[in-house]
Swiss-Prot record:
<keyword id="KW-0482">Metalloprotease</keyword>
<dbReference type="InterPro" id="IPR001261">
    <property type="entry name" value="ArgE/DapE_CS"/>
</dbReference>
<protein>
    <recommendedName>
        <fullName>Peptidase T</fullName>
        <ecNumber>3.4.11.4</ecNumber>
    </recommendedName>
</protein>
<comment type="similarity">
    <text>Belongs to the peptidase M20B family.</text>
</comment>
<feature type="binding site">
    <location>
        <position position="385"/>
    </location>
    <ligand>
        <name>Zn(2+) 2</name>
    </ligand>
</feature>
<feature type="binding site">
    <location>
        <position position="180"/>
    </location>
    <ligand>
        <name>Zn(2+) 2</name>
    </ligand>
</feature>
<dbReference type="GO" id="GO:0006508">
    <property type="term" value="P:proteolysis"/>
</dbReference>
<dbReference type="GO" id="GO:0008270">
    <property type="term" value="F:zinc ion binding"/>
</dbReference>
<dbReference type="Pfam" id="PF07687">
    <property type="entry name" value="M20_dimer"/>
</dbReference>
<keyword id="KW-0479">Metal-binding</keyword>
<feature type="active site">
    <location>
        <position position="86"/>
    </location>
</feature>
<feature type="binding site">
    <location>
        <position position="84"/>
    </location>
    <ligand>
        <name>Zn(2+) 1</name>
    </ligand>
</feature>
<feature type="binding site">
    <location>
        <position position="146"/>
    </location>
    <ligand>
        <name>Zn(2+) 1</name>
    </ligand>
</feature>
<dbReference type="InterPro" id="IPR036264">
    <property type="entry name" value="Bact_exopeptidase_dim_dom"/>
</dbReference>
<dbReference type="InterPro" id="IPR010161">
    <property type="entry name" value="Peptidase_M20B"/>
</dbReference>
<dbReference type="GO" id="GO:0043171">
    <property type="term" value="P:peptide catabolic process"/>
</dbReference>
<dbReference type="GO" id="GO:0005829">
    <property type="term" value="C:cytosol"/>
</dbReference>
Length: 412
């Protein structure tokens, strides 16, 4: 078990990391998309050097890499640990003011001095957290547990390994920028991250072990109109907003995020922007099954073609589809040790593994596309990307315990 001083260190690390404003910018053309990510990267470089890691580097893209050699000649495997620097652009991450609740007694939690609160009426998982120390927001920003809890857990595990001289395998560490917008991982230096397999520490509830994720793409549909004074518009105006609203009606009403779960895919209208003369709709396309994923992309393409044929527009609507990431399972299944080791580590510290698909993506999906198996491990956090985000300190401790147990590389 982790000592009290280590629990304090873990909390202090987390509170320090969330003080960095690292929100990524979705329309950025370069990485890192925000200055704060580089600042946090430089801070982590300094701490990794202090912990005695080797080859600690920060690239111009704010990718942090480091290496800790095995301290036991019998432990020859190399395991990677990955977490990301940025926070979601979907909710403000500036001036995060965490609040620590010792021994949560149940019931609603008021956030700051405003009207925001977290209630077990809406979030049933809170009933499992009674008696634990919770870190919440003040109701004005997200918390940043996604993924600074993961960073704090990795750093604390490394600190304990070094202080207590615990036998461990070779360890590679990477902290990446712009995971939330799928940008930074494209600048990942694979040549500096040679390992047998790796883990992203980017999951949620205690026990989560994830090695299947969505296939993902983004579709942008552009509509072009013609504006004229409304008093004289008959037979002359073409309203791009109206065209876009009509097009949106072709999508299946039940195949949306708010009506699907498990391994069921969806279309998600993420953004609707523009005016009478030009509108752009942005859709997220998600599915676990590769064939269904291809069919979803074909569906949008076919609907655009039908819409253009039906309307006979002088300037037809345009479609752009960009793949984001792929399901990692096809790679992970060929490295079953990556799942077995995480399973054994959780059981060794009294945690029941919960294998579940990720209804999203991680940096591990990209690493898998490069041939590196990279399952995802829990952080103890909940309600990511929102003002209701929270993390359990005990859950974070559990993650540290699992990381240390995995790095012992027993029976490999």
């Amino acid at each position: 078990m982790i000592s009290q001083i280590d629990k304090t260190e873990l909390l202090e690390r987390f509170l320090h990391y969330v003080s960095f404003h690292t929100q990524s910018k979705p329309n950025a053309k370069h990485s890192p998309s925000s200055v704060g990510q580089m600042k946090l990267a430089m801070q982590l470089q300094k701490e990794l050097i202090q912990l005695g890691l080797e080859n600690v580097e920060v690239s111009k893209y704010a990718v942090v890499t480091a290496f800790l050699p095995a301290n036991d000649p019998n432990l020859t495997k190399t395991i990677g640990l990955v977490a990301h620097l940025d926070t979601s652009p979907q909710c403000s991450g500036k001036n995060v003011r965490p609040e620590v609740i010792e021994e949560y007694r149940g019931g609603d939690i008021a956030l700051g001095i405003g009207e925001e609160f977290i209630s077990p009426v809406y979030y049933s998982f809170m009933q499992k957290l009674v008696g634990q120390t919770l870190i919440v927001t003040d109701g004005t920003t997200l918390l940043g547990a996604d993924n600074k809890a993961g960073i704090a857990e990795i750093m604390t595990a490394l600190s304990i390994l070094q202080k207590e001289n615990i036998p461990h395998c070779n360890i590679r560490v990477a902290f990446t920028p712009d995971e939330e917008i799928g940008l930074g991982i494209h600048y990942f230096p694979m040549e500096k991250f040679s390992c047998d397999w790796a883990y992203t520490i980017d999951g949620g509830e205690v026990g989560e072990l994830e090695y299947e994720n969505f296939n993902a793409a983004t579709a942008k549909v552009r509509f072009f109109g013609r504006n004229i004074h409304t008093g004289y518009a008959k037979g002359k105006m073409l309203n791009a907003l109206t065209l876009a609203c009509e097009f949106q009606q072709v999508f299946p009403v039940d195949e949306v995020p708010e009506k699907t779960d498990g391994k069921v895919g969806f279309y998600h209208l993420e953004d609707f922007s523009g005016d009478i003369e030009q509108v752009e709709l942005t859709y997220l396309i998600r599915d676990f099954d590769e064939q269904n994923f291809a069919q979803r992309k074909a569906f949008i393409k076919n609907q655009v073609e039908k819409f253009n044929a039906k309307k006979g527009l002088k300037k037809p609507i345009e479609l752009e589809i960009q793949d984001s990431y792929q399901n990692m399972y096809d790679v992970v299944k060929n490295v079953p040790q990556s799942i077995e080791l995480a399973d054994r580590a959780m059981k060794a510290v009294g945690i029941k593994p919960n294998h579940k698909p990720i209804r999203g993506g991680t940096d591990g999906a990209f690493l898998a596309s490069k041939g590196l198996a990279c399952p995802n491990i829990f952080t103890g956090g909940y309600n990511f990307h929102s003002k209701h985000e929270l993390v359990s300190l005990q859950g974070m401790e559990n993650t540290v315990q699992v990381i240390i147990e995995m790095l012992k590389c027993k029976d490999l």
